[in-house]
Amino acid sequence: MSDFFAGIPAVTYEGPEARSDFAFRHYNPDEMVMGKRMEDQLRFAVAWWHSFAWEGGDPFGGPTFQRPWFGDTLDHARAKADAAFEMFRILNVPFYCFHDADIRPEGASFAETTANLEAMVDYLGQKQEASGKRLLWGTANLFSHRRYMAGAATNPDPDVFAYAAATIKTCMDATHKLGGANYVLWGGREGYETLLNTDLGREREQAGRMLQMVVDYKHKIGFEGTILLEPKPQEPTKHQYDYDVATVFSFLSEFGLQDEVKMNIEQGHAILAGHSFEHELALAREFGILGSIDMNRNDYQSGWDTDQFPNNIPEVALAYYEILRAGGFDTGGTNFDSKLRRQSLDPADLIAAHVAAMDVCAAGLKAAARMLEDGELEQRREDRYAGWRAPSAEAMLNGGKLEDCFAHVMETGLDPQPVSGGQERLEALVARYL
């Protein structure tokens, strides 16, 4: 057990009037929301990288955090795990997520790095068994090391492709051994800086082949979790191939993988792509590929991925509304891909930030459930398209021809007039539930 969070009590639900930073006002794990316990609807997870591996640096300055587990040995990695599971206990979160590089030290060779990962997987397995905590998803860091500066799957060097594939295998093995519910692929540097030295077609084929290899290996080892792709439009490269949900679905369809792979959608990445979070979730729901979410927020003025903790209940409510419309999470969940500001140095800051974020999500979920159960918003949406239920409209949609439409307009003197969309009234309706 770690003493890093000494003096911080286990966080429990105390109700809306609670004033402590270490009490839940809205998140009550056992409260029933649309037929499920709130814990089972939200499926909260802590991100290992931001909470325990990030050192507080930025492009203009070095680390600001001084954590006792910062170091390059297995002892440091085990100390980090001890602190992590103590935090999971305090917050009573059921899940966590990691990249391989977050949980193990880098070795002098691939074999040594793999051995370090295997040692830490054994240690995390012991921690899981003792605590009851579970792995929501694992993934491979294929972007930090200099070998990946031109990408991993899309690298012009086949040796880098092979090294990345081998690394993914070790991470899938780790995720499988720990009972992970999903395996995530984020194309950290799968993109380009300039078209002057880029073969777009070749790199797309390479990315498709890598993903097919991942799917094949999933079935070979009997991994029953979901393979998830995470879209992001830019940063760190100028243009990322996995730009947004629509782009990734096109990619999956091209390689026949749309029934094998779903999406892990991040709020901050949606904003970078010029979309709202709910837009990306709704589109993934329509495509049948909504898998899991990374919950955070961006600074709307800065223009880059700030990974702040969520604090906007109306935004979060609209996101969970789309998730509930999809039937809720299956293997996915709500991972806090969120980090402290570099001036927030204290252990208590890390706990308080997650407590507040969990409350925001719980409040948003309850508002979303009220909207969906009430049914008025869906009824108004349905009414807007009522004309399409007419037999003539259905026939037009299911096999109509341009010449038939032309004849109909000419014969009837058709002159359709616009109907109000009522957006302001719909926004007022949504506000009633918040």
Curated annotation (Swiss-Prot):
<feature type="binding site">
    <location>
        <position position="337"/>
    </location>
    <ligand>
        <name>Mg(2+) 1</name>
    </ligand>
</feature>
<comment type="similarity">
    <text>Belongs to the xylose isomerase family.</text>
</comment>
<dbReference type="InterPro" id="IPR001998">
    <property type="entry name" value="Xylose_isomerase"/>
</dbReference>
<feature type="binding site">
    <location>
        <position position="307"/>
    </location>
    <ligand>
        <name>Mg(2+) 2</name>
    </ligand>
</feature>
<keyword id="KW-0460">Magnesium</keyword>
<feature type="active site">
    <location>
        <position position="99"/>
    </location>
</feature>
<comment type="subunit">
    <text>Homotetramer.</text>
</comment>
<dbReference type="GO" id="GO:0005737">
    <property type="term" value="C:cytoplasm"/>
</dbReference>
<feature type="binding site">
    <location>
        <position position="294"/>
    </location>
    <ligand>
        <name>Mg(2+) 1</name>
    </ligand>
</feature>
<feature type="binding site">
    <location>
        <position position="266"/>
    </location>
    <ligand>
        <name>Mg(2+) 2</name>
    </ligand>
</feature>
<dbReference type="InterPro" id="IPR036237">
    <property type="entry name" value="Xyl_isomerase-like_sf"/>
</dbReference>
<keyword id="KW-0963">Cytoplasm</keyword>
<feature type="binding site">
    <location>
        <position position="305"/>
    </location>
    <ligand>
        <name>Mg(2+) 2</name>
    </ligand>
</feature>
<dbReference type="GO" id="GO:0009045">
    <property type="term" value="F:xylose isomerase activity"/>
</dbReference>
<protein>
    <recommendedName>
        <fullName>Xylose isomerase</fullName>
        <ecNumber>5.3.1.5</ecNumber>
    </recommendedName>
</protein>
<keyword id="KW-0413">Isomerase</keyword>
<feature type="active site">
    <location>
        <position position="102"/>
    </location>
</feature>
<dbReference type="GO" id="GO:0000287">
    <property type="term" value="F:magnesium ion binding"/>
</dbReference>
<keyword id="KW-0119">Carbohydrate metabolism</keyword>
<dbReference type="InterPro" id="IPR013452">
    <property type="entry name" value="Xylose_isom_bac"/>
</dbReference>
<dbReference type="GO" id="GO:0042732">
    <property type="term" value="P:D-xylose metabolic process"/>
</dbReference>
<feature type="binding site">
    <location>
        <position position="266"/>
    </location>
    <ligand>
        <name>Mg(2+) 1</name>
    </ligand>
</feature>
<feature type="binding site">
    <location>
        <position position="230"/>
    </location>
    <ligand>
        <name>Mg(2+) 1</name>
    </ligand>
</feature>
<keyword id="KW-0479">Metal-binding</keyword>
<keyword id="KW-0859">Xylose metabolism</keyword>
<feature type="binding site">
    <location>
        <position position="269"/>
    </location>
    <ligand>
        <name>Mg(2+) 2</name>
    </ligand>
</feature>
